[in-house]
Amino acid sequence: MTLSKRLLDLGLALLLLVVGMPLLLGLAGLILLRDGRPVLYLSERMTTPQRGFLLWKFRTMRPDGADRGVSGGDKADRITRTGHFLRRYRLDELPQLWNILRGDISFVGPRPPLRRYVEMFPELYAQVLRQRPGVTGLATLAYHRTEERLLAPCRSADQTEAVYCRRCVPRKARLDLIYARRRSLCYDLRLIAATVIRRIPLN
């Protein structure tokens, strides 16, 4: 990671934390009142093929001790009413500002994968994770809705896993590697702006 990229991460994360603290506290209170504890969902993700970290999110689902893999249609009935709202505008990812400050992730980069997928596709993720993972990125912007459409019909964890591994992992990795070739501070700012614009409610 370049110094300019790290300074952008730190400056923007601190600014958003200060300005957005009332929103963060309000959302935490809303989850606590409507859905109970825990307010946060902590998930192990990988920042390099060898090093994991705990990714912070606001909880959007009812807890399930047997939960594994990515979210597909098989988990749709566990999403809370508050969770639907948070996911629609990606507000569930606001706690990741803490991960950015810690240096676990950047604002822009490939989404940090679960350990299970790094172990299933070691050669692929050895390339993808040469760059620091991020909250948003080219693959997130270009493929997220397609991924949701592909996984929504899945009715079991095994089916979700099969579709994700066969259809989503290689396509997202291809986009992540395109980003790696194009990355620059200006390109990161363009991707951040595109992410914000996409999440603004227009109706």
Please give the residue ranges for each predicted region.
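Short, glycine-rich, amphipathic interfacial segments at transmembrane boundaries or analogous
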Residues: 41-78, 139-170
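A short, structured surface patch at a secondary-structure boundary
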Residues: 74-138, 192
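Intrinsically disordered, low-complexity boundary segments flanking structured domains
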Residues: 25-29, 43-44, 122-130, 159-166
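Short, hydrophobic secondary-structure boundary micro-motifs
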Residues: 27, 41, 70, 108-110, ...
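Positions in alpha-helical segments
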Residues: 13, 41, 80-84, 116, ...
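C-terminal terminal-structure detector
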Residues: 130-203
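A generic fold-level signal
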Residues: 35-38, 74, 100, 133, ...
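A hydrophobic, helix-centered structural microdomain
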Residues: 1-64, 179-203
